Amino acid sequence: HKPNTAVAQAYYNKQAGIKRITTETGAGQWGCSMALAGQMFGLEVRVYMVKVSYGQKPYRRSMMQTWGAEVFASPSNMTQTGRDALAADPNNQGSLGLAISEAVEEAASRADTNYALGSVLNHVALHQTIIGQECKKQFEMAGDWPDVIFAPCGGGSSFAGIAFPFVADNAAGGRNGKMVQLVAVEPSSCPSLTKGEYAYDFGDSSGFTPLMKMFTLGHDFMPPGIHAGGLRYHGASPLVSQLYHEGLIEAIAVPQLATFDAGVMFAHAEGIIPAPESNHAIRGAIDEALRCKETGEAKTILFNLTGHGHFDMASYDRYLAGELEDFDYPEAAIKESLKHLPNVG
């Protein structure tokens, strides 16, 4: 789904006379999309890829380079932010917040360069709502309507994309009186919505971005090296966060092994190997179907299959070999990270 916003951002940057784009990527889907969009419009693209994913997913790096992008493992020696992080911890595996800091720092130093973000911000959520709009059209054609929607949630772009168009219907009383349950599914190792604090925080580790009110684990939160790299972000989109704060959407956190169980089950049933991020939504959908089986309810379940896992097979290799582990981020560590939230008076 990432090209939905990458192409739009590249187009408008080109119209503004920008020559270069810097950006971050976790698992690499966003970096690939921005590299492709930059190639389409003749923009140079530099991608700071979270180090743990840089090692886990080498072929996404190859894709970005095929489309002409430069790719660096973050934290890197290219920026002061990266150098400081490496000085503090030479084995730092990186985070999306840290990669964002590096990309923003570089963009701020050059007049011909802008920074592009692949999630979190309002315009990204807007571009992604084409997903939910298309779903609504397809349900109208099928003569059906979902009872519940599941989508993975890190920064929030894929969840916003499928859920926001249905939020409008719910606010108006539902489609023919039918309200849709909207569920964001996040990793238990990075539980921004389910365990974070609703507060003003920076979107990056170094505090370069404007403050945003969101559910956050703290901008210097360093998540473990789970294989759903696209969900390793300390906060959730301000719009997603506001909806959750107001009780208009729900959120659940699921452990890593359960998501891979769901991904393999889906591959057996559908012949599609999902991305680790997508497995979170699939886990939610399967669990809902099993609940319906127990209660005898009939529900129409919609979930967002955000991508395939063809470049994530090393992660599946580790799962099949029994080498993956679950990790619930300790409450004490979350509380410690939240102590560093900015004081906004």
Locate predicted features.
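Phosphate/ATP-binding catalytic cores across multiple sugar-kinase/actin-like superfamilies
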Residues: 110, 130-145, 287-291
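Glycine-rich oxoanion-binding loops at beta->alpha junctions
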Residues: 1-20, 120-140
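Claisen-condensing/thiolase-fold acyl-transfer catalytic domains that form or cleave C-C bonds
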Residues: 153-157, 161, 256-322
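Buried hydrophobic positions in well-ordered alpha/beta secondary-structure cores of metabolic enzymes
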Residues: 2, 9, 28, 38, ...
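A short, small-residue-rich loop immediately preceding and capping a beta-strand
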Residues: 5, 16-52, 145-158, 182-183, ...
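Active-site-proximal loop->helix
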Residues: 22, 30-93, 192-202, 313-321
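Alpha-helix C-terminal capping segments
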Residues: 7-18, 32-44, 65-66, 163-172, ...
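Active-site/ligand-binding loops adjacent to catalytic centers
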Residues: 79, 85-123, 131, 142-143, ...
